[in-house]
Amino acid sequence: MSAAQARHLTTLATGRYGFELQTLMERAGESLAGLAAHLAPDGPVLVVAGRGHNGGVGLAAAHCLARARRAVWVVPTHEAENYSGVPKELLERLAELPNVRLRSSLPKMKFSCALDAAVGMRLEGPPRGRTLDVITVLNNLGCKVLSLDVPTGLAADSGEVPGDVVRASATLALALPKPGTPPGGVVGDLYLASFDLPEALFHDVGLEPFVAPSPWARIV
C-alpha cells in the first residue's frame, strides 16, 4: 500500500465509513503497544512521537503501555503548541498519568524498548534538525527499536534512504505493508496489524485486505 493509498484509506474510513480518527489511532496504538510488550515484556519504554497520525498512534500506544503499568517516557518531536487534534488530546491526557514522563529531550537511561513514531510515511528529503537528532539517539540506545509503518528516514514507497535512518529491530505496518519496507535491513522483522477494518474499505482503494490472525502477524 503506497503512502497515497494509505492517506486515501484514512480519508474514506473517517468519511464514508464513519470511523472516528481517535478510534483508528487507539486501535492501532493497542496493536503497537501489544507488539512492544511481546518484544520487551518488562522494563521502561521510550516513545518518540511526531505531531501527525504516526505520532498519534505512538501516543495511543503510550497510553496502553501506561495502563499496563509500564514506566513510559514520551518525547514529542515538536513543542506541545505545535500539536493539534487527536495527537494533542492524547499528549495532554498522557501528562496526567503518574507512570508517564514527558520530556523535551531524549533521556540518557536504559530502556527495554523504544517506539519510533516520529515521521512515518511523510518523509521529505534527508532528515535534519530534531528528526536527525532522534535518529541518532534511537540508533545508540542499545535496546530494541520498534518503528511504526516505516523506520524514520526511510521512504515508504521507494525504500530509498536519503540520509540517516533508524535501524529498527522490528517494524509494525498498519493495514498493509508499504512497498519500500521488505523484511530485513533497517526494517528488521516486519509485522502487520489489520485492526478490523472492513474489507470493502480496502476494495474502495483498489487493494486486497490482509486479516492478521491475531492483533499482529509477522511477515516473512
From Swiss-Prot:
Co-factor(s): K(+)
TM annotation in the entry: none
Protein name from the UniProt record: NAD(P)H-hydrate epimerase
Family: Belongs to the NnrE/AIBP family.
Keyword Isomerase: yes
Keywords: Isomerase, Metal-binding, NAD, NADP, Nucleotide-binding, Potassium
Positions that bind (6S)-NADPHX: H53, N54, G55, G56, V57, G120, M121, R122, L123, E124, G125, P126, D149
UniProt organism field: Truepera radiovictrix (strain DSM 17093 / CIP 108686 / LMG 22925 / RQ-24)
